[in-house]
């Protein structure tokens, strides 16, 4: 796992990946078993797996959640695996630990004055899409920019899930799961980098 993470970080330095201070943050569910078998899934329960909700699929699942910080070009710059019940805002705090000078675009799950102020104190700016009835909503033009840029996340997660089967858990333990997710993200970033070098589509 440490070797994979080292390779991933080296990739971000060696390949022509644009150096950016603008990022998109989001998360996706990582169910470790079918919902009905959750009580028998002891190997993962001992490593923090619990119940969480997936708003996009409108379902409850048992497992973890993968939080990702993604560049506007689509590279996964950082990721964190937490229990499924962990709030997205807490996941973001972990992701940007030790970082500063970032502008982060998020959806409604990242709205919160406490979080925004906490990130601002570290030199980061959080621009999260607010609810339509919010009294402090962003101007229409800004909302359109955030929404447009956030569409990159849908493409990234779609490729991770559809082409790399990132959401399909075959590991029997937490360490194996972490290694597998790290390998998938490394493979994704590598293919994206090769695409930019050869100006061709590299099959994931």
Task: Show where each model-derived region lies.
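Short alpha-helical elements
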Residues: 1-204
């Amino acid at each position: 796992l440490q070797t994979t993470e080292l390779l991933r970080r080296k990739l971000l330095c060696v390949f022509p990946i644009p150096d950016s201070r603008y990022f998109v943050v989001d998360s996706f569910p990582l169910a470790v078993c079918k919902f009905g078998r959750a009580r028998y899934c002891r190997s993962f329960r001992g490593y923090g797996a619990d119940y969480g909700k997936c708003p996009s699929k409108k379902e409850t699942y048992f497992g973890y959640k993968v939080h990702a910080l993604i560049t506007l070009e689509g590279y996964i710059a950082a990721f964190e695996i937490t229990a499924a019940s962990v709030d997205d805002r807490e996941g973001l705090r972990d992701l940007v630990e030790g970082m500063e000078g970032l502008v982060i675009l998020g959806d409604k799950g990242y709205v919160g004055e406490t979080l925004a102020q906490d990130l601002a104190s570290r030199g980061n700016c959080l621009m999260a899409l607010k609810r339509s009835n919010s009294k402090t909503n962003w101007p229409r033009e800004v909302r359109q920019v955030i929404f447009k840029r956030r569409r990159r996340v849908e493409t990234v997660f779609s490729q991770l899930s559809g082409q790399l089967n990132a959401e399909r858990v075959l590991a029997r333990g937490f360490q194996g799961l972490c290694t597998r997710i790290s390998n998938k993200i490394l493979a994704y970033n590598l293919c994206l980098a090769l695409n930019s070098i050869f100006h061709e589509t590299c099959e994931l």
